[in-house]
Regions:
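Structured mid-domain segments that build the active-site/substrate or prosthetic-cofactor binding neighborhood
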Residues: 1-77, 81
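Short amphipathic alpha-helical coiled-coil/interface segments
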Residues: 83, 87, 91, 109-121
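Conserved, mostly hydrophobic/aromatic
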Residues: 94
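Short helix-adjacent coil turns
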Residues: 100-105
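Amphipathic alpha-helical coiled-coil segments
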Residues: 119-129
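Extended amphipathic alpha-helical segments with heptad-repeat/coiled-coil character used for oligomerization
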Residues: 129-139
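Conserved small/polar residues in nucleotide/adenosyl-binding loops
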Residues: 140-149
Length: 150
């Protein structure tokens, strides 16, 4: 827990814009990605290796805790952030390869970046809270409720 407090839970590191750093995975493709939204940021000031260590520690207890919904949610959330941090590094390297005209390196890095996106999808797909369908169904129910009370 201390690692999380010193990294992603630390307000000094995760409130630079309108909230926590946004993932480049969610951003419009580009060479210079500052954020996924117009009001956010993609600045990760904490030590990314520390968060990777937290993920390792969570995974080490998988067999003991796999039946805990809270553990599964936290694990998915931490793994998604580790993958997003990794994607950010690859995106920067891809941009550098593109700018230098190194098509082979750009292609290699692009393939790795796309595989990270696939991993993010698999990890977040384990939790209903991360699924788009969950949000659209909630909106539909909320909208129907509002319409009945108008």
């Amino acid at each position: 827990m201390e690692i999380l407090h010193d990294t992603v839970y630390n307000p000094a590191y995760n409130m630079k814009g309108q909230g926590a750093p946004e993932s480049v995975v969610n951003a419009r493709p580009g060479l210079d990605i500052g954020a996924a939204s117009t009001w956010g940021n993609a600045v990760v000031d904490y030590d990314k290796k520390k968060l990777e260590k937290a993920a390792e520690l969570l995974l080490a207890d998988y067999d003991k805790l796999k039946n805990s919904a809270g553990y599964q949610y936290d694990l998915a959330n931490v793994l998604e952030q580790v993958l997003s941090n990794t994607a950010q590094e690859y995106q920067k390297k891809m941009a550098a390869a593109f700018r230098s005209g190194d098509a082979e390196e750009f292609s290699t890095l692009s393939d790795k970046f796309l595989s990270i996106i696939d991993m993010v999808e698999k990890v977040t797909g384990t939790q209903k809270e991360f699924l788009v369908g969950t949000w659209t169904v909630s909106y539909t129910h909320l909208r129907a409720h509002e319409t009945r009370h108008d």
